[in-house]
From Swiss-Prot:
UniProt KW Hydrolase keyword: yes
Gene: xseA
Protein species of origin: Lactobacillus johnsonii (strain CNCM I-12250 / La1 / NCC 533)
Protein name according to UniProt: Exodeoxyribonuclease 7 large subunit
Record flagged with keyword Nuclease: yes
UniProt function note: Bidirectionally degrades single-stranded DNA into large acid-insoluble oligonucleotides, which are then degraded further into small acid-soluble oligonucleotides.
Single GO MF annotation: exodeoxyribonuclease VII activity
Gene Ontology annotations of biological process type: DNA catabolic process
């Protein structure tokens, strides 16, 4: 008996079933809703999970290129809408759903998507206060991004022209609702940015509405573009109770378009009033400062040091006189002490008669005398140096003032200063130097004195 059975391989069967799925038009584009199950996020990879309802579930694959386009972060148990196609995975012979799009289900999904995006951008620091730019006090030009037909631009222009007519306002129209709104808002902001520093501040806004109506101002692309603006942005989206991500990232938020215009412009009347007040305060401060400086000048004019400038050096002159006196006294005391020592040694030498002792004493005397003269010479040299320095200080201060107190100095015919009577001879001609001239005298008598007493 001939066996007419045809046996297929497992691969052939899986391929056949796969072709059935691909040829079925109902499975080319399938839209599903369900709850995410077994979802485990895989970094930089394809995502594998299940989609289930109350009665059954199906395995789902979402390739990395599709997953990276999602505007929210899927989580376990989240209800979602997905679209894609059904096919067979050949190696295992199992069919599964290949998801191409995914979005949260219902209005709650929008809030969840908003929450996730807000957390993401907050972690990046887009809402931090340190990134907020200061609104200029006196803007020259203001750019407004809103609908060209709404009441927003009218309220802004009326308020700004009333408060600060100097400011020029330019409208950059954009759709503020619908699927294309986010792209037009971003395009308008980029157009403003491309003009450099033409504008001082930007106002972006629209009137109130539902979450879906305000959704363009929650789009990530809009938030990032506001953050990237080089000039400050004031957001006025919806009513005061509405808060969008555009409000959080903007440099300032206003509850209404009118409030936004007030935020962007100063009140000219208030500014003029402040100028008048500041002018009065400035004038008073200047007058007070001038009065204070006059008082200081009067005190300086009456200061003793300016009335008698020479008194500045009185203390230094007294110090020099005191040093000279102490130097002379020290030299006299040292000479008296050393003279007494010498005389004592001479007496002791006379008391010793043996020649050897005499020779020894002679050597000791010579040694002592040598040391004495060396010490005296060194001491005198040191004292002379100190005296010279003191005299130099005195001379630096005012040598003429020393002469003006009645002092004179004497020179011989060669111009040498005479400091001792030992330098003089009878009938020798000398010059006495005064502060206002010189006198020539002859030596008639020479009398030596020691310590102020005439020598006998």
């Amino acid at each position: 008996m001939v066996d007419n059975k045809v046996y297929l391989s497992v691969s052939d069967l899986n391929f056949y079933i796969s072709q059935k799925f691909k040829n079925d038009p109902y499975l080319h584009k399938v839209f599903l809703q369900g709850e995410l199950s077994n979802f485990r996020f895989r970094m930089n990879s394809h995502q594998y999970f299940s989609l289930k309802d109350e009665k059954s579930k199906i395995n789902v694959v979402m390739f990395r290129s599709f997953f990276e386009k999602l505007k929210f972060k899927p989580e376990e148990g989240m209800k979602v809408y997905v679209s894609g196609y059904v096919d067979v995975y050949g190696p295992q012979g199992s069919y599964q759903f290949y998801a191409q799009t995914m979005e949260p289900a219902g209005l709650g999904a929008l809030y969840e998507q908003l929450r996730q995006l807000q957390e993401k951008l907050a972690k990046e620091g887009l809402f931090n206060e340190e990134h907020k730019k200061k609104i200029p006090l006196f803007p020259d030009r203001i750019a407004v991004v809103t609908s060209a037909s709404g009441a927003v631009i009218h309220d802004i222009m009326v308020t700004a022209n009333r408060r600060f007519p100097h400011a020029e306002i330019d409208l950059y129209p954009a759709k503020v609702q619908g699927d294309e709104a986010a792209d037009t808002i971003v395009a308008a902001l980029q157009q403003i940015q491309a003009q450099g520093d033409k504008y001082d501040v930007v106002i972006i806004g629209r009137g109130g509405g539902s979450l879906e109506d305000l959704w363009p101002f929650n789009e990530e692309k809009v938030v990032r573009q506001i953050y990237a603006m080089q000039m400050p942005v004031i957001s006025s989206v919806g009513h005061e109770t509405d808060t969008t991500l555009a409000d959080l990232v903007a440099d300032a938020r206003a509850a209404t378009p009118t409030a936004a215009a007030e935020y962007a412009t100063p009140n000219l009347v208030d500014v003029l009033t402040q100028i008048v007040q500041l002018r009065a305060r400035l004038y008073a401060a200047v007058q007070a400062n001038i009065h204070t400086k006059h008082q200081i000048l009067d005190r300086l004019k009456n200061a003793p040091v300016l009335q008698e400038p020479t008194r500045i050096y009185d203390q230094q002159i007294q110090q020099v006189d005191m040093l000279i006196h102490r130097l002379n006294q020290a030299m006299d005391n040292r000479l008296q002490h050393d003279g007494s020592t010498l005389r004592l040694l001479q007496e002791r030498l006379k008391a010793l008669s043996p020649s050897r002792k005499l020779e020894q004493l002679e050597r000791e005397r010579n040694f002592v005398v040598s040391n004495l003269f060396s010490t005296m010479n060194n001491y005198l040299k040191d004292q002379r140096n100190r005296l010279n320095r003191a005299m130099q200080q005195l001379d630096d201060i005012s040598p003429l003032k020393t002469i003006s107190r009645g002092y004179v100095y004497t020179t011989d015919q060669k111009g040498n200063i005479v400091t001792s009577v030992d330098q003089l001879k009878i009938d020798e001609k000398l010059k006495l130097h005064f502060k206002d001239g010189q006198v020539q005298v002859n030596v008639e008598n020479i009398r030596r004195e020691k310590n102020g007493n005439q020598e006998k």
